[in-house]
Regions:
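Histidine/acidic residue-rich metal-binding segments in metalloenzymes
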Residues: 44-187
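Metal-associated gating/positioning segment near the N- to mid-region
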Residues: 1-25
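A glycine-rich helix N-cap at a beta->alpha junction
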Residues: 22-36
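Short amphipathic alpha-helical surface micro-motifs
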Residues: 13-19, 41, 124, 147
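Active-site beta->alpha loop and helix N-cap motifs at the rims of alpha/beta catalytic domains
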Residues: 36-42
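Active-site neighborhood of phospho(di)ester-bond hydrolases with catalytic His/Asp-centered motifs
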Residues: 1-9, 32-35, 61, 90, ...
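Short acidic, glycine/proline-enriched helix-loop-strand junctions
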Residues: 12-16, 29-30, 80-85
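Surface-exposed, flexible loop/turn segments at secondary-structure boundaries
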Residues: 8-9, 39, 95, 147
Length: 187
């Protein structure tokens, strides 16, 4: 299991990596650390990625926080090159989805909820793929939720870019149509 740095404190030091990855006698699971790419996962200053990689992290990410600054993403991809580090980003334009509660569409309108446009994800995927083309390296997109973003990843793979992605389980099982019943289990 790879543990994202959505912890308090954030996994961003050699000591926190050692703590998270320590062997647990009697437990059949091995935990690998994904370290924060920026200090406190706030998107401002880079962590000591080379030291963290030497300490045993398997990837770098700000977890649920999308890295918004294009120049920062460029620097991350360049910095990870010498040791083949993997950058995991959750592609969301936070200004476009601000105050959004569900997918933008008919159900959101009917429920009177602010929707989050699909382009907020696909624009960030496009940006990061362009930066990946420029720098080389490898990137993983976490929690993709739109067909457009998946198609962009598919096309990038065909062009030879080292890109992977995942989808959250609830996004495979449920759609915005399910919210029309006001089922509180779907919050």
């Amino acid at each position: 299991i790879a543990l994202l740095p959505n912890t308090h404190p954030v996994v961003q030091t050699k000591e926190s990596v050692a703590y998270v990855t320590r062997p647990m006698p009697g437990h059949p699971v091995t935990v690998h650390a994904v370290a924060a790419v920026t200090v406190d996962a706030r998107g401002k200053d880079l962590t000591e990625m080379m030291d963290l990689q030497r300490a045993g992290v398997v990837a770098f990410s700000d977890g649920h926080n999308s890295l918004q600054n294009s120049d920062m993403v460029l620097k991350v991809l360049q910095y990870l090159q010498p040791f083949g580090g993997l950058f995991i980003n959750r592609p969301e334009d936070t200004l476009l989805i601000q105050f959004g509660t569900m997918n933008e569409g008919v159900p959101a309108t009917m429920l009177g909820m602010k929707g989050m446009p699909r382009m907020a994800e696909s624009m960030m995927v496009m940006r990061d793929l362009r930066l990946l083309e420029y720098t080389g390296g490898k990137i993983h997109f976490a929690c993709l939720s739109t067909a457009e973003a998946v198609e962009l990843v598919r096309q990038a793979k065909k062009r030879g870019l080292r890109v992977t992605c995942d989808v959250a389980a609830h996004q495979v099982v449920f759609t915005d149509q399910d919210l029309m019943q006001f089922d509180t289990h779907l919050k």
